[in-house]
A protein has these predicted regions:
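C-terminal structural segment of proteins
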Residues: 1-135
Length: 135
């Protein structure tokens, strides 16, 4: 008999998305994302077929990914602060999307091919990071 259940609350913001062929169809791919107070991200990719998989990126990992991308780009812009903030968010979104997309294992079925699901993974991660950074 279950007597007590304790759920610890974590300060975080959350976002969920799914891609479906039709509104009432099973999803082709789902993405749940969380940004914790310490700057770390958690992404859960589901409906891929197989069990949902978790990807965690600490703030240090994210910073390393962004710095690696910045080294590849040697362009120096004199933008406004707002544009720089948006550019930083976009770089973070692209880096995290690439990082998760390269790791996720997908397969094909009647709802979508493995390549399509990999592409959707990147798109959904980018969207999630943009939304979570704006909150």
């Amino acid at each position: 008999i279950l007597v007590k259940l304790i759920v610890h609350k974590n300060k975080a913001v959350y976002h969920y998305q799914s891609v479906r062929n039709t509104q009432t169809d099973f999803p082709v791919l789902t993405c749940a994302a969380a940004k914790r107070a310490d700057g770390a991200y958690r992404f859960i990719i589901g409906a891929r077929p197989g069990r949902a998989v978790l990807f965690e990126a600490s703030a240090e990992t994210i910073q390393a990914l962004v710095e690696e991308k910045q080294k590849a780009e040697t362009k120096a812009d004199a933008d406004t602060r707002e544009n720089k903030d948006k550019a930083q968010i976009e770089k973070k979104a692209v880096c995290l999307a690439t990082w998760v997309r390269d790791q996720v294992q997908t397969s094909s079925n009647m709802r979508g091919s493995a390549e399509y699901r990999k592409h959707l993974t990147g798109v959904l991660i980018k969207r999630a990071v943009r939304v979570l950074e704006d909150r």
